Regions:
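N-terminal cap/lid segment of alpha/beta-hydrolase-fold proteins
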Residues: 1-30
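Serine-hydrolase catalytic core
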Residues: 12, 176-296
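Short, surface-exposed "cap/lid" segments of acyl-processing enzymes
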Residues: 28-76, 80-84
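Alpha/beta-hydrolase active-site loop
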Residues: 88-112
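Gly/Ala-rich beta-loop-alpha elbow adjacent to hydrolase catalytic centers
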Residues: 121-126, 130
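Active-site signature of alpha/beta-hydrolase-fold catalytic machinery across serine-
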Residues: 132-136
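Active-site nucleophile loop of the alpha/beta-hydrolase fold
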Residues: 144-154
Length: 297
């Protein structure tokens, strides 16, 4: 059994009036100086990854508050509410760009609660989303990237195996298909999107609708953390990057990924020492202890 710290459920709305729900864990003593906001990955949520549970305890023990919340793109397909009116949300149907509004809403929520120094922490596709936010906002103190991957390369490999198609060809085809749908919620076949990882633990199909996949392919996940011909960028915030040695979704060598992040993050600390997978299973305590050492330095 894994225990978490004692938190309280919170809710806040993004600019599209979608209610976002999460858990906040506040450090004792009334200190509202430091907080880490966790942004989950593709089809994830605020509680599923067990390292989140351990962070809630370990961060609090060090005087760091912690917020973990559901993006509009959480899970696959879920019921959400916009000003009390039902709307279907989730990774399979939501527009990728709304996740950036979700992050903005979370930052505004903790700022209004009195927190002064906000750190954004992303896992997997959450790394791409917080990166886009940081590149367009100047209200973040530090950045934590857990298992960032080249999503373009992952989809490129998937399409080569399952569709005999390039990402650009898929994009053009989906754009035409999207124009013909006229607002219909159109589910694609299961060979359109997925991961053909470099080990058996990371091979899976991802159900998705046309508009949602098109928004992902055209979003920041396919632009910035892209080792071949990606959009150039530079982040000058203090940044912690975790790269597990056995990450089956990393489509390049560990050395190439380390070089990439060192090039694009000017104040970067890279932890590439741990022999664990994309979800950091079995190395949670060691990772969190290392993050805290970096954070407190």
């Amino acid at each position: 059994m894994i225990n978490s710290a004692k938190g309280r459920l919170v809710a806040f709305d993004n600019k599209k009036n979608l209610e976002l729900i999460g858990l906040i864990f506040e450090a004792d003593g009334g200190d509202k100086e430091n907080i880490i906001i966790h942004v989950h990955g593709n089809y994830g949520n605020f509680y599923n990854n067990k390292f989140i549970w351990k962070m809630s305890e370990k961060y609090l023990n060090c005087g760091i508050s912690f917020l973990t919340f559901n993006l509009s793109a959480h899970d696959g397909l879920c019921e959400g509410y916009r000003k009390g009116i039902l709307d279907y949300v989730g990774g399979a149907v939501s527009d990728y760009s709304e996740s950036i509004l979700d992050i903005e809403a979370a930052v505004d929520f903790v700022k209004k609660a009195g927190y002064e120094k906000v750190t954004l922490q992303g896992h997997s596709l959450g790394c791409d989303k917080i990166l886009e936010y940081v590149l367009n906002h100047n209200d973040i103190e530090k950045v934590i990237l857990l298992s960032p991957v080249d999503s373009y390369a992952v989809q490129e490999r998937w399409l080569g195996i399952h569709k005999n198609e390039t990402v650009e060809e898929q994009l053009n085809r989906l754009r035409k298909l999207c124009k013909s749908e006229n607002g219909i919620l159109q589910w694609l076949d299961l060979n359109e999107y997925g991961a053909e990882g470099l080990n058996d633990d990371w091979i899976y199909k991802i159900p998705v609708t046309t508009k949602a996949l098109l928004s992902i392919l055209q979003g920041s996940a396919f632009k910035f953390i892209k080792l071949k011909n990606g959009v150039d960028f530079l982040v000058d915030k203090e940044t912690y990057v975790f790269l597990g040695k056995n990450d089956g979704l990393r489509m390049c060598s560990l050395e190439d990924m380390v070089n990439f992040v060192n090039k694009h993050f000017t104040q970067c600390y890279v932890n590439d020492r741990m022999a664990c997978d994309h979800d950091i299973i079995g190395a949670e305590d060691a990772l969190i202890n290392d993050i805290i050492l970096w954070y407190k330095k």
